[in-house]
Swiss-Prot record:
It comes from the Bacteria. The gene is atpH. F-type ATPases have 2 components, F(1) - the catalytic core - and F(0) - the membrane proton channel. F(1) has five subunits: alpha(3), beta(3), gamma(1), delta(1), epsilon(1). F(0) has three main subunits: a(1), b(2) and c(10-14). The alpha and beta chains form an alternating ring which encloses part of the gamma chain. F(1) is attached to F(0) by a central stalk formed by the gamma and epsilon chains, while a peripheral stalk is formed by the delta and b chains. Belongs to the ATPase delta chain family. This is ATP synthase subunit delta.
Length: 179
């Protein structure tokens, strides 16, 4: 198991005990945003010559007052153990486990033309009944090549109810039977 994943698991267990699943999620991604937007934060975090105590104090100055103390403690622990490089990966491992706990599932919806909220609600209800997907997050893509129908991709599952998919299936069957 990857070290970043172990830290994320420990943090998730703590979040569950403290009733702060969503708060930790938000805070971890606030810190991740610092990586993307604040070069000084990254420079301080990865400065190998700076004393650990100085580094922790400087890093705390970058953090918003709203960041939970447990998240701040995690960052300090990573600095103490010289594992700062794990910090950008922890939010994504946490998100993966968080999504499983609360039932979030990324669902790619491929259609031949735009769909409205009513269609997405029907898909959501079907996913709940058929696959126990409680909180689908839809990412709709329009692909005119499917001709009509719908294709869903989620959790390594593909549900193909497109005209193109049906035609491809018939074509494959005809080729197999012709041999």
């Amino acid at each position: 198991m990857l070290p970043a994943k172990r830290y994320a698991e420990g943090l998730l267990k703590l979040a569950q005990e403290e009733g702060k699943l969503e708060k930790f999620y938000e805070d971890l991604f606030k810190i991740y945003d610092l990586f993307k937007t604040n070069k000084q934060f990254v420079d301080v975090l990865f400065d190998l010559e700076m004393k650990v105590s100085n580094k922790k104090e400087k890093i705390k100055q970058f953090l918003d007052e709203s960041i939970d103390r447990y998240i701040v403690n995690l960052i300090c622990l990573l600095i103490d153990k010289r594992r700062e490089t794990l910090l950008p990966y922890i939010p994504f491992y946490y998100k993966e486990m968080y999504d499983k706990i609360i039932g979030n599932v990324e669902v790619e919806v491929i259609v031949s033309e735009e769909v409205d909220e009513g269609v997405l609600r029907k898909i959501s209800n079907w996913l709940l009944k058929r696959y126990d997907v409680k909180n689908p997050r839809f990412k709709v893509k329009v692909d005119r090549s499917i001709i009509g129908g719908i294709k869903l991709l989620f959790n390594n599952i593909e549900v193909d109810a497109t005209i193109k998919g049906a035609l491809d299936s018939i074509k494959k069957e005809l080729i197999q039977n012709a041999i």
